[in-house]
Amino acid sequence: MVAIPLRIMTADAHPVFREGLAAILSAQSDMALVAEATDGNQALSLFRKHRPDVMLLDIYLSGMSGLDVIAKIKNDFPNARFLVLTTHTGDAHVQRALKAGASGYLLKNTVRRYLLESIRAVHHGQRRIPSEVASNLVEYITAEALTAREIQVLGQVANGNANKIIADRLSISEDTVKAHMKNILSKLAANDRTHAVTIAIRRGILELDAVAS
C-alpha cells in the first residue's frame, strides 16, 4: 500500500526562496507541494482551499503578517500545523510565533535534512526549535517585558521624535515619557535611547514596519 504524501503549502514573498523549497519538497517521496502563496491574504485563502498538512511560512508577508495568518487559521482549524521559516532570530519574534500557534520556528539558513525532519516532526504534533533560536529564548526568559505603553514610547523614539512630540502624540506628560524611558533603558540593559531602539529591533520587540510608519 502506497503511503499518502504529506500535503505541504508554502508562503513567502521571495520567488527564489519559494522555488528552492519547491525543489527540495519535490525530491521527497513522502511530500507533495499543494500550494504556494506570495502574501498573507493569499496564504489565508489558499490554506482554506487546500487544507495542507503542514504550512511553511515567513513572519513577514505583505497584506497580512505570517503571525496573523497563523492565528486566523488556528481559530478556524485548531489542528492546523505551521512551521515558521524566517531570518529573524529575536526572542520576541519566536514568542509571538509560538503564541500564535506555530509548532516550529526555523531559520532560512537551516540545512535541508533538518528542515525535512522538522516538517515530518511538526506533522506528528512535535515542536521544532533549533538550538540557536532556543538560546535566544533562554537568554531573555527571565527579563522583564516592556509594557504596551513602553513599546509605544520606544516606537516614537525610533522614529526620531523628541520627548515633547512623544508626549503630545500619546497624550501624556513629558515627565511620564521620561519615566517610561528610564524603565525601558533598565529593562533592556541599554546605554541610551539609540541603543534601546537597536536592541528592541534585534529582539523583535519593535517591528520594522511599525518603526517606519
What label would you give each PLM region?
Residues 4-17, 21-25:
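Conserved acidic segment of CheY-like receiver
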Residues 30-38, 46, 190:
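Short hydrophobic/Thr-rich beta-strand motif most characteristic of the beta2 strand and flanking loop
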Residues 39-42, 65-68:
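Acidic catalytic/metal-coordinating carboxylates
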Residues 58-59, 86:
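Active-site residues of response regulator receiver
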Residues 62:
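The feature encodes the CheY-like receiver
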Residues 92-99, 103-152, 205-208:
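Short, flexible helix-to-coil linker/hinge segments that flank and couple to helix-turn-helix
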Residues 162-195:
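Recognition helix of helix-turn-helix DNA-binding domains
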Residues 186-213:
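Basic, Lys/Arg-enriched C-terminal extension of HTH/homeodomain DNA-binding domains
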